[in-house]
Amino acid sequence: MAETAEPEGGAPSPQGPPEGSALLEERPGEPDPAGPEASEGAAKAPSGEGAGAAAKAGATEEASGGRDGEGAGEQAPDAGTESGGETPDAKGAQIEAEGAPEGTKAPQLGEEGSGGKQVEESGPDCELRGEAAREAEGQAAAPAAPGAQEEAVPGDSVDAEGSIDAGGSVDAAGSVDAGGSIDAGGSMDAGGSVDAGGSIDTGGSVDAAGSVDAGGSIDTGRNVDAGGSIDAGGSVDAGGSMDAEGPAGGAHGAGGEPQDLGAGSPQPRSEAVEVAAAENEGHSPGESVEDAAAEEAAGTREPEGSEDAAGEDGDQGRPQEETEQQAERQEPGPETQSEEEERPPDRSPDGEAAASTRAAQPEAELSNHLAAEEGGQRGEGPANGRGEDGEASEEGDPGQEHDITLFVKAGYDGESIGNCPFSQRLFMILWLKGVIFNVTTVDLKRKPADLQNLAPGTNPPFMTFDGDVKTDVNKIEEFLEEKLAPPRYPKLATQHPESNSAGNDVFAKFSAFIKNTKKDANEIYEKSLLKALKKLDAYLNSPLPDEVDAYSTEDVAVSGRKFLDGDDLTLADCNLLPKLHIIKIVAKKYRDFEFPPEMTGIWRYLNNAYARDEFINTCPADQEIEHAYSDVAKRMK
């Protein structure tokens, strides 16, 4: 961070213990941190006292009959010293208005205590020169305030209505004029020092809507447009005058409220230094200070002091792009926004430009806020995919479109999925449809009362669809195929009617086979079961009409399809596969019966089903199936 010399008359930075009047003397031999430019600006001042004395002398020389402004120069203890160097404690800079002698008058809130305001009100040059001279003489003769260990500089008076606390903020309700005075409507926080030794020419005034946090010092040698607050972590070297929307652009509130500057939060320290560094190219620190003092003394500067006056001077003007960039970097705080609502509108060109900048920022924030809310609403959505009016959402909406709950038989532990081919049948259909649904297992041993009231006298499976209770399995299948239809949901009906009847007698043959307890009759029941299985196997190995190419000379001997009606699962598979799986598990467990290896169609069919999530994730555990038939598959005698 670049460091610049503090102009004379500024409050000392808060480092080192107070040393009384010994610190009023210049420190010989200390290096000038501001470089050649600061030394050149200081050399232009009468009596060699620096930019602050030069500005004061230029403003009061004609009025006081050639007085060389040495009163301001005698009280500059830190001329040429480094910002933040070894200076008295910040408490030495506390000048309490209520504790000052009678010769020093602290202006009340809303009063103008600066030369810039007086120029606007008085107008004639004679009143300007006389008032500046009286102010300088009166403040030079006044003794230091009690408790203050450093005298107030006449060219740089600090009029504080409250107290000047170390660690607070500078709320400049008044204006900073050529005399360098700061009218603090609230309190001044000398965290470092606010150095106004040179003249701060605002054409209007410097209105800090936020706070001036001077961690180092503010060397006003150039033009700084304070669209909001000035946060000088090190030192801000402004080559011209501090240009802001002053009283000419819009009147202050009755209570000395700061004027609307479009931003209230402090500007980031690094950004403030970058802006000051960009503005400081090609200008010496005291260059515009002397020009400002000379123009005010000659009565040539306009009191309106916004960008119009500064823009006509090539040295003092600043491109509009820099002003817009600085305004964009400042974000208004909640306190500033509340103050802006109470202040009258700014009618000056700069005020209108600042208002447009302020208006653009909330619109962008509101737009982003609305976009964020709309994005959140789209992401969350209704839980069941339905709008407030109860209508189903649009096609393709990933949300839940219907409120569906499937009640299935619970296992012997009362929680897991139990053995029930009809429950698995509906489970597979809902899964294949791709609809969002809930599954509730029902323990038949202790059926809850609410379920008894929901479907009295009905055992699982049953279903609720958007509040309607469905209990018949075959009708539920038809209802789901009709309600959850394409294009939103896949069609599960078969293309070939023969697929619906294939294997329809297998489960009945199996039930007779597993319930038989007579060894003599076992062979009969087993042959009956094998006959039904061979019929099913033959259908699975027989090519479907769409598998046969009418233009091919080769006959397809064996089908290669995965399921009953083709390579996709259908309603026929949802009915047959759960039963075929139960036959495979129970016959092996209790009758040591397996599907013959030569039944390649059945084995291909089962293996393809075991590779599908819709089947294996709806199947009960093998132990559940075996446990369910433990009482049925009695030992043969």
Curated annotation (Swiss-Prot):
Query: Which residues form the sequence repeats?
Result: 155-160, 161-166, 167-172, 173-178, 179-184, 185-190, 191-196, 197-202, 203-208, 209-214, 215-220, 221-226, 227-232, 233-238, 239-244
Q: Which reaction does it catalyse?
A: chloride(in) = chloride(out)
- Where does the record place Low complexity bias? 35-63, 138-152
Q: Which GO terms describe its molecular function?
A: chloride channel activity; D2 dopamine receptor binding; D3 dopamine receptor binding; D4 dopamine receptor binding; oxidoreductase activity
Q: Cite the EC number.
A: 1.8.-.-
According to its UniProt record, how is this protein modified after translation? Phosphorylated.
- Entry's localization field: Cytoplasm; Cell membrane
Q: Name one GO cellular component term.
A: cytoplasm
Which keywords accompany this UniProt record? Cell membrane, Chloride, Chloride channel, Cytoplasm, Ion channel, Ion transport, Membrane, Oxidoreductase, Phosphoprotein, Repeat, Transmembrane, Transmembrane helix, Transport, Voltage-gated channel
Motif placement: G-site: 420-423
Q: How is its activity regulated?
A: Channel activity is redox- and pH-regulated. Inhibited by IAA-94.
Q: Where is the composition biased (Gly residues)?
A: 247-256
Note down the stretches annotated as region Disordered.
Answer: 1-400
Which of the residues bear the PTM Phosphoserine?
Answer: S39, S348, S393
Tissues/organs with expression: Expressed in brain, chorioretinal, lacrimal glands, submandibular glands, airway epithelium, kidney and gastric mucosa, where it is preferentially expressed in cells that secrete or transport water. In brain, it is highly expressed in choroid plexus. Not detected in pancreas, adrenal glands, heart, skeletal muscle, ileal mucosa, liver and lung.
Which parts of this chain are annotated as the region 15 X 6 AA tandem repeat of [GEA]-[DGR]-[SN]-[VIM]-D-[AT]?
155-244
Q: Where is the composition biased (Acidic residues)?
A: 305-314
**How does the entry describe the domains?**
The active G-site contains a monothiol Cys-X-X-Ser motif which mediates glutathione-dependent redox catalysis.
The cross-references to NCBIfam families, in alphabetical order and at most eight, read:
O-ClC
What PANTHER family does the database record attribute to this sequence? CHLORIDE INTRACELLULAR CHANNEL PROTEIN 6, CHLORIDE INTRACELLULAR CHANNEL PROTEIN 6-RELATED
What's the name of the protein? Chloride intracellular channel protein 6
Q: What is the lineage of its organism?
A: Eukaryota, Metazoa, Chordata, Craniata, Vertebrata
